[in-house]
Amino acid sequence: MDLLSIQDPSFLKNMSIDELEKLSDEIRQFLITSLSASGGHIGPNLGVVELTVALHKEFNSPKDKFLWDVGHQSYVHKLLTGRGKEFATLRQYKGLCGFPKRSESEHDVWETGHSSTSLSGAMGMAAARDIKGTDEYIIPIIGDGALTGGMALEALNHIGDEKKDMIVILNDNEMSIAPNVGAIHSMLGRLRTAGKYQWVKDELEYLFKKIPAVGGKLAATAERVKDSLKYMLVSGMFFEELGFTYLGPVDGHSYHELIENLQYAKKTKGPVLLHVITKKGKGYKPAETDTIGTWHGTGPYKINTGDFVKPKAAAPSWSGLVSGTVQRMAREDGRIVAITPAMPVGSKLEGFAKEFPDRMFDVGIAEQHAATMAAAMAMQGMKPFLAIYSTFLQRAYDQVVHDICRQNANVFIGIDRAGLVGADGETHQGVFDIAFMRHIPNMVLMMPKDENEGQHMVHTALSYDEGPIAMRFPRGNGLGVKMDEQLKTIPIGTWEVLRPGNDAVILTFGTTIEMAIEAAEELQKEGLSVRVVNARFIKPIDEKMMKSILKEGLPILTIEEAVLEGGFGSSILEFAHDQGEYHTPIDRMGIPDRFIEHGSVTALLEEIGLTKQQVANRIRLLMPPKTHKGIGS
């Protein structure tokens, strides 16, 4: 079949099981080939081919609503809804988004990127449907990893109480990104081996009604029998206790089982949970045999060998540098512990976990719990390192305020993937943390200019005993600078001048320092002497240096790879105002007030104007006409 010619999923309605199985093979081959060039979330999508096809065969999208939790497993859905020709642009600038996108297709009714939101979304859609009096099916698809998120459990509780008609698909592959952890994961394991409870329950009810004379009485006790069966046949029938009709577990790669159970679910009143067992990476051996999450999401790869195609890094990854330095210090300090919300691989904590298994805590998709747990461990004299992506730190904001900062707990927050992250797009860009962290009392916030300063900042953070401290660092690899052998402490709230200058000052930090220096060197050719300051402490700022700069009266440009509203530049404006310096020219560069789409970091920086050319232009505009010796001089 020509998969690129698919316009909508209606063609599935008349296909036989044999034809569907052949289609599945073709879809898998298409994904393996296409993603080998573009990269993407291959493991999750290979695992849901039959499930996605069966859903589109049995339901009528977009009238019936599919809500893909997290959304990285929606590639097959995109293919079946007419976007095959765009797969060559997957996750590229102005190309096909790697997650559901409402502006992309009417079949994408709910946008995702973070986990555990689909059930709340489904409850909202079901409530709206019932108020409007329409009859569409609401079908959230959630993984066993996402089900560990507190928000998902809150929604399960509410849905079961409201008894709204919906069909929850539990896609159970025993992994989210890394192997799942926790009691809910263990409970699902028991369900996988418990047999088909629903079938037995229905058969017994049927038999009761067939018995002469006493059949009616027995049928009347069917509910009590059902309750007994729950405990006799399925240990820990969690979902039934919450008010769901539980179906399964079923083979997520068997069209016979999927279609039979989906048809049964459509006839069942109230909330139904269909427990589907799938194999992540099915059909491609390297992904199918992955046990740690390497093939969850990848860059380009060689199909025949499974080798990843990427240039050899000249420097270690930022995640590896930070976790490695924490591990190094943990050898000397038994108080140091590491906490991650389901990202041990991405945060490069495998080495720490292997060396210190009793001091490593993967709490699952539970950012709020992770933050509060870190605060409590700090209260008991430990030195917690909370490794968390910038985009996921948003989910723990209240706990950072209420439990960590309010109690002035000695927690080191490693804010990974800070700044633009590229291909994962607007749900994953790490651009909000400065704005929502710098206004919290007791918080220290910093970002290094390179990996050498980064290792010293880790040492500074784990040596700091006066409250919470956070270090943001970007995705990807360091610059390859020479590394000091001896770790040292950087005085809190101190900046450094990287390049002297007497005509203007650039205040920046982290990834934007390089473009600032390059812009200053370009302006030097025009006779402008521009100072570049490594403003490595975002909070507290270096007040002594700032007062000196303001006293000089030099124009100031701030640059940050983060949102402007409430960001670092705002803090400089506030400080100047508080010092009564109303006449110093101050300009700010950063992320504009909108969500930044997917694409390469280079393309995105170009689009929003964060380039050395634009930095130079902004400095030129700040200068009094007589100072600028460039064009027209």
Curated annotation (Swiss-Prot):
Its pathway is: Metabolic intermediate biosynthesis; 1-deoxy-D-xylulose 5-phosphate biosynthesis; 1-deoxy-D-xylulose 5-phosphate from D-glyceraldehyde 3-phosphate and pyruvate: step 1/1
Keyword list (alphabetical) reads:
Isoprene biosynthesis, Magnesium, Metal-binding, Thiamine biosynthesis, Thiamine pyrophosphate, Transferase
Q: Which domain of life is it from?
A: Bacteria
- The kind of enzyme this is, by top-level EC class, is transferase
Offer one example of a GO biological process linked to this entry. terpenoid biosynthetic process
Query: From the UniProt record, which GO molecular function terms apply?
Result: 1-deoxy-D-xylulose-5-phosphate synthase activity; magnesium ion binding; thiamine pyrophosphate binding
Question: Where is thiamine diphosphate annotated to bind?
Answer: 72, 113-115, 145-146, 173, 284, 367
Cofactor(s) recorded for this entry are:
Mg(2+); thiamine diphosphate
Does the keyword Cell cycle feature in the UniProt annotation?
A: no
Role, per record? Catalyzes the acyloin condensation reaction between C atoms 2 and 3 of pyruvate and glyceraldehyde 3-phosphate to yield 1-deoxy-D-xylulose-5-phosphate (DXP).
Family membership noted in the UniProt record: Belongs to the transketolase family. DXPS subfamily.
What is this protein identified as? 1-deoxy-D-xylulose-5-phosphate synthase
